[in-house]
Design a protein with these regions (language model features):
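Hydrophobic beta-strand-centered segment that forms part of the acyl-chain substrate-binding groove
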Residues: 17-69, 83-88
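Core beta-strand residues in small-molecule sensory/regulatory alpha/beta domains
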Residues: 45, 73-79
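Short coil/turn motifs at secondary-structure junctions
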Residues: 63-65, 77-79, 93-97
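Generic alpha-helical hydrophobic packing signal
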Residues: 67-68, 73, 102
């Protein structure tokens, strides 16, 4: 599977996460706001083939009034459900679509995010979080 399909799958996972916190399409239209991905990192841990059944787990690592630090990990349950095959780390920015500037998220969304972060606080930080690109010299 090539990079475009990984990005597409992770993009759908981001949409599902946004729906979960109350930022569905209707809410975005009503509030005239959306989120922009301002930074993204992908890691490829193991090859998957077109047609493999894939699963994505998402979690929010951190947030403030305008930003969300989101992490997705993809597995291939039919091969090895515990083997991470790819990850996607994102920084999302809440944007007022009328001014095209960052804005504070509504209080209801911030409250939902805060609850999610508290529920996930005991989980270990994935090793891929904060990774950088570079050639490691010996």
């Amino acid at each position: 599977m090539n990079v475009a399909y990984y990005v597409l799958i992770f993009d759908h996972a981001t949409d599902a996460f946004l729906e979960c916190i109350g930022m569905n399409e209707a809410a975005r239209i009503a509030s005239r706001a959306s989120v922009f991905v301002v930074e993204a990192h992908l890691t490829y841990e193991k090859e998957v083939m077109v047609g493999d059944a894939l699963s994505v787990e998402s979690r929010i690592l951190d947030a403030d009034s305008k930003r969300m630090h989101l992490f997705h990990q993809m597995t291939c349950p039919s091969n090895n459900p515990d083997q991470v095959v790819a990850t996607n780390e994102l920084m999302l920015l809440y944007v007022d679509m009328m001014t095209r500037r960052s804005a504070d998220m509504p209080a209801t969304i911030r409250s939902t995010i805060k609850k999610l972060i508290c529920n996930q606080n005991d989980l270990p930080t994935p090793i891929q979080v904060g990774s950088t690109i570079g050639i490691r010299r010996r």
